[in-house]
Design a protein with these regions (language model features):
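Short aromatic-glycine-(Arg/Gly/Cys) micro-motifs in beta-strand/loop hairpins
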Residues: 48, 112-137, 172, 178
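Charged/polar low-complexity intrinsically disordered segments, enriched in acidic residues
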Residues: 160-198
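Short, structured interface segments
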Residues: 71-82, 143-159
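Long, continuous compositionally biased terminal/linker segments
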Residues: 38-81
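Short Lys/Arg-enriched alpha/beta "domain-start" segment
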Residues: 1-24
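Short N-terminal "domain-start" leader segments
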Residues: 27, 80-121, 163
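A short, exposed loop/beta-hairpin motif centered on an aromatic-Gly-Thr core
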Residues: 59, 131-145, 159-161
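A cross-family detector of function-defining hotspots
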Residues: 32-38
Length: 198
């Protein structure tokens, strides 16, 4: 699959915007890729083809390794939605500008993205009965992960009750750890193995 120079440029521009929002400095190199800096010190590079490149000397501390991993996570998410934005159809509804693209559509819910100078903005809407309009928008600005989760719940792909908050996950972990480390329950070896895998 060939990606045009314009698509690569839009991808790198979006990555630069998102990285800046997350506290990283990024600038273009003479080769057209992005150079990412942390505290004004080179951290890694982002080639036009996606992914990241780095020198081991630039990620020599746990903090810099974590920062490199965060950049990689950001770049993967940006690549995912920019690939979709480049190929997605325009959302055609009455009274809405043509800059929104349909990223996902299931049941009566649509997930759309709209490019802006602040990065791609995401929204989920309910379709009207005749699919000529949308309503009840949930706006996520640049938060792609939350927009995807909202779409999955609103469209019925998953039930909200199947998701846990970070606080709930902490308590589940604590209870599992207490169950196997304490003498609260008589557990079989198989039950203990399953709980430890959590």
């Amino acid at each position: 699959m060939n990606i045009s120079a314009e698509e690569k440029n839009r991808y790198l521009r979006e990555a630069e915007v998102v990285l800046a929002r997350e506290g990283f400095q990024a600038d273009r190199t003479h080769a057209g890729s992005l150079r990412v800096l942390l505290d004004d010190v080179p951290l890694c590079g982002i080639p036009e083809s996606g992914g990241i490149t780095y020198r081991m000397a630039d990620v020599s501390t746990p903090e810099r390794i974590a920062a490199k991993d965060k950049v990689y996570s950001i770049v993967r998410a940006v690549a995912e939605y920019m690939y979709q934005m480049e190929r997605a159809p325009i959302l055609k509804v009455d009274g809405l500008e043509d800059s929104y693209k349909v990223l996902a559509d299931f049941n009566v819910v649509v997930l759309a993205g709209c490019p802006s100078k602040y990065g791609v903005q995401f929204v989920t809407w309910d379709w009207d009965f005749d699919r000529r309009g949308v309503s009840h928008g949930h706006y996520f600005m640049e938060n792609y992960d939350e927009a995807k989760q909202d779409f999955a719940i609103r469209s019925g792909l998953i039930h909200k009750e199947q998701l846990f908050s970070p606080e709930q996950m902490t308590e589940i972990y604590r209870c599992c750890a207490d169950s196997v480390d304490g003498d609260f329950f008589d557990l079989t070896a198989e039950q203990e193995k399953v709980i430890r895998s959590v």
